[in-house]
Amino acid sequence: MLRNLVVRNACRNRPSIQVARGLCRHQTRRLMASSPQFGRNSNQEKTAGFIMGILSMAGALYFIAPNRKPLFASRKVESDKTAEEELSSGGEQSPENEDDNNSKSDENGDDNDSKNDETEAGPQLGGDKIGASKVAEDGELVVLAEEDNKSSEDKDTDESKVSTKDDEQSNEDNATANNQKDENISSENSEENTSDKTLDNNAGSSEKKDPEHSDDEKSQQGQSDDKTTTEDNNGEEESSKKTVSDSENSAKQSESSDEEKEELRKQEEKQMGPTEEEVQHEGAYNPDTGEINWDCPCLGGMAHGPCGEEFKSAFSCFVYSEAEPKGIDCVEKFQHMQDCFRKYPEHYAEQLKETSDDEEPQDKVKVNTIESAPNVSSAKENAAKKAEQSDVKKEPLNEESKP
């Protein structure tokens, strides 16, 4: 496709002479076929089109000129007429015929381009087709193309020779470097072997000369090893003892610190004494000592009034009672205390109010139980009435049932 486009662009819009156009196409195909590198570069395509255009113009002018000479000396034609006669016959046509031919060629130019891209040159002279290979076989363009091919081949051969020379030189350099490395390695190995041999000889001679000295050294080394092992064992035992003693000391210190803290708390409590709130919340009876604090504010001063003795006897009875449930044997003493409180309402007004408040719900409970209890007499009367009614109903039924 690329070559066909180049041929069309090079040979289009030229003077409408079929012979010149056919030569232009033929020469462009020969040039492209002879140059293998054609089409790789856009610059080459442009130059080829420009050259083909110039050649087509030159051919057209040559065929239009009256005194023309043959274009190629070695041209051959199969027909009886020579190329010059055919061209002269085509050139000596009348101007009217030339105009007609020009108009026809312009109209059918594109069709001829598409038909004659591969094999035919396109022009018809006297009804005979001139083949592209027969119009010009040994032209100057072919010679130039061959020279270009030769020059490119020479360049390729020169480059290949240079590359082969470079490769040979690099291979030689690598070989020499490898040989030098091998020589250096062998020399180093030989030196090491000689040094090892000398050391072995010196060691053998020293052993032969001083066997007793070597035995002494061995015994000394063994003693030193034993000493080091014993020292290590002693150090481990000491470290274990230290750790045990440290742990014991830490435990003792912790215990002593706890005891000291408790003692300090007790001393502070004794010095500070109980606060008013603590005294109020504490009970009158101390279970540790088994004594009763009659001055305790929780008793409300009842132990020091006119009924103090009755209160003390009742309270101590409740505290020291061993009966279960506790306080059953102290009920009578408690009743005597309440009777004493009623004699002195001025001193025990609050206590009497509390006892009255406690007795009211008890009285209400008793009343409710009495009211809720069924009346035995009324129940008996109701039962008798029901029995009489049932007897009355049965008697008429029995009378009706008799015949």
Swiss-Prot record:
Entry GO terms, CC: mitochondrial inner membrane; mitochondrial intermembrane space; mitochondrion
Stretches assigned to the Mitochondrial intermembrane side: 67-403
Necessary cofactors: Cu(2+); Zn(2+)
TM region(s), chain numbering: 47-66
All ranges on the Mitochondrial matrix side of the membrane: 33-46
Chief site of localization: mitochondrion
Location of the protein in the cell: Mitochondrion inner membrane
Residue spans of biased composition, Polar residues class: 369-378
Alphabetical keyword list: Disulfide bond, Membrane, Mitochondrion, Mitochondrion inner membrane, Oxidoreductase, Protein transport, Redox-active center, Signal-anchor, Transit peptide, Translocation, Transmembrane, Transmembrane helix, Transport
InterPro entries hit by this protein: CHCH (IPR010625), CHCHD4 (IPR039289)
Domain description: The CHCH domain contains a conserved twin Cys-X(9)-Cys motif which is required for import and stability of MIA40 in mitochondria.
Described purpose of this protein according to its UniProt entry: Required for the import and folding of small cysteine-containing proteins (small Tim) in the mitochondrial intermembrane space (IMS). Forms a redox cycle with ERV1 that involves a disulfide relay system. Precursor proteins to be imported into the IMS are translocated in their reduced form into the mitochondria. The oxidized form of MIA40 forms a transient intermolecular disulfide bridge with the reduced precursor protein, resulting in oxidation of the precursor protein that now contains an intramolecular disulfide bond and is able to undergo folding in the IMS.
Protein name per its UniProtKB record: Mitochondrial intermembrane space import and assembly protein 40
Native organism: Saccharomyces cerevisiae (strain ATCC 204508 / S288c)
Encoding gene (name): MIA40
